[in-house]
């Protein structure tokens, strides 16, 4: 009788453990999985809102960039001495923003959100990607162009050579054209979010820079835009 009670007790315990499996297998309450996100317009808006703080210029941007110009270049020249900076310690050779933008574009493209709103937020991301790449082109010239998220273990993609400057600029223009065509043409009373007018303003600035560059570098054989 004692053995029967022991066996019954063990079986009861096992049944309780098995029945609790679903209860114990809970997703973290402070994290979202991709499958739980990108399902609504609000999701897309929240994700793109994170780009503003990370990628818009701050108060020191002008000062820092002036250090690369003619006025203060003598004081900043050690920055560009061979070996002084590398991809490890130089902030501009950083691809986390590009990775986040490409990840969003890929996820948003397959989102069930209504097409017009979906294209608007993809346009926001592509505008930020254009700006990110333009800053890199101004600093480095040729850079590798990534239009899709890549596997962090894919060394061939991570270590591949730079793409020609002209190809990257053409890709930047394609991103800006998409943004102009798809961003909402609605005045933002708060003047704090990306609209079609913002895209047109950025496109004009980049076109002026690139057109001037090509005009005074005829040896490159590039069409003036």
Where are these regions (language model features)?
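Short coil/turn linking the two alpha-helices of tandem helical-hairpin repeats
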Residues: 137-138, 144, 187, 209-218
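Acidic, serine/threonine/proline-rich low-complexity intrinsically disordered regions
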Residues: 149, 214-225
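Bacterial Sec-dependent N-terminal signal peptides
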Residues: 1-29
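Membrane-proximal, proline-rich intrinsically disordered regions
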Residues: 20-63
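TPR/Sel1-like alpha-solenoid repeat signature
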Residues: 126, 200-206
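Aromatic-lined, polymer-binding surfaces characteristic
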Residues: 142, 146-148, 190-201
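Conserved, well-structured interaction surfaces
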Residues: 33, 43-49, 55-57, 74-140, ...
């Amino acid at each position: 009788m004692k053995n029967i009670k022991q066996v019954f007790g063990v079986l009861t315990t096992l049944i309780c453990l098995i029945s609790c499996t679903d209860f114990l297998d809970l997703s973290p309450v402070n994290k979202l999985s991709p499958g739980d996100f990108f399902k609504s317009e609000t999701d897309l808006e929240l994700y793109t809102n994170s780009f503003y703080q990370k990628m818009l210029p701050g108060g020191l941007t002008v000062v820092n960039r002036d250090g690369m110009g003619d006025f203060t270049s003598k004081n900043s020249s050690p920055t560009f001495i061979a070996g002084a900076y590398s991809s490890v310690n130089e902030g501009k050779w950083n691809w986390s923003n590009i990775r986040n933008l490409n990840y969003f574009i890929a996820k948003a493209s397959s989102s069930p959100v209504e097409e017009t709103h979906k294209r608007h937020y993809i346009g926001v991301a592509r505008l930020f990607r254009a700006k990110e790449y333009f800053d890199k082109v101004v600093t480095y010239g040729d850079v590798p162009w990534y239009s899709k998220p890549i596997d962090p273990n894919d060394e061939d993609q991570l270590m591949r050579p730079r793409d020609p400057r002209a190809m990257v600029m053409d890709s930047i223009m394609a991103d800006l054209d998409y943004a102009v065509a798809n961003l909402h043409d609605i005045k933002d009373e708060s003047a704090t979010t990306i609209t079609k007018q913002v895209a047109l303003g950025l496109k004009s600035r980049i076109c002026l820079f690139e057109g001037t560059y090509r005009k005074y570098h005829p040896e490159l054989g590039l069409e003036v835009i």
